[in-house]
Amino acid sequence: FLAVVVVALLVGVALLVTGVVLLLTGKLRFAIAEGAGRDVALLEAFALYLGLMTAGLVWGASDLPGGRAVGLPLLVLAFALGIGWPFLGRREGTTTTDIRRALGLHRGRGVLIETLAGVAGYIALLPVMALGILITFTLTRISGADASHPIGDELTGPLAVFILLTSFAAVFAPVSEELMFRGAFFGHLRTRVHWVAAAGIIGVIFGAIHPQGWAGVPAIAMVGFNMAVLRQWRGSIIAPIVAHALNNGTIVLMVGLALR
């Protein structure tokens, strides 16, 4: 396993250096930020999503009436309202096509090309993610804080639960989180500040809302930052979704199989 990680990091470094060189020489270009991203409906959509999602997570993890039976539907509702509001609340003069492009809801250069870009981009940005993991590891060693995900305790349950959790982590979470964080929020924020600053801000917020605690923020923030880089590069949301799914799916499968 360690050998696979080392090889992946080495390949990632090679791809990252190549990408930076191509970018500096003008042979690699980032997508142009869509003007419709300035529509405040995208920011409103993210606020709706974040509020309801937080409520769903808190409700599902607490002793409130219904527990997860209430928390999970709230998560679905959060995504439904979040993805629907930009179209319903768009300002005059903004078309549905404008909103779709602002969210990254298009095929880019084609589904296959964007999917491959997501895989290549994920590997290329592994060194950046490794830096975040190193910071988190250092913080846990110094403070004794626990940066593990609560889902780990449930991966040893019945096979049906394992499959459900894996599907949630590798399908629903990447699709919903990318459309909201890198689609709506990043799509809007990068029209207000430089895209690197927008990616950093969103990365920190992305890390802070996860249940790994404060020590886990650097590692998850780097993941969020990387996904924003992919969105900025491709324009389409497909590559970030693929990279996010690859990240979550790999982690859940490895941890789950190791514990079972």
Feature names for model-found ranges:
Residues F1-G104, V252-R260:
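N-terminal, membrane-interfacial amphipathic/helix-forming hydrophobic leader that caps
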Residues G56-V76, R91-A173, T191:
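Juxtamembrane helix-loop-helix connectors linking adjacent transmembrane helices
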Residues E44, E114, E177-E178:
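Acidic-residue sensor for enzyme active/binding pockets
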Residues G35, V40, G110, A173-P174, ...:
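Residue-level recognition of hydrophobic positions within alpha-helical transmembrane segments
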Residues L9, V13, I123-A130, I142-R260:
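Transmembrane helix-loop-helix hairpins at the membrane interface
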Residues A33-L57, G118-A124, I201-G216, I220:
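Hydrophobic alpha-helical transmembrane segments of integral membrane proteins
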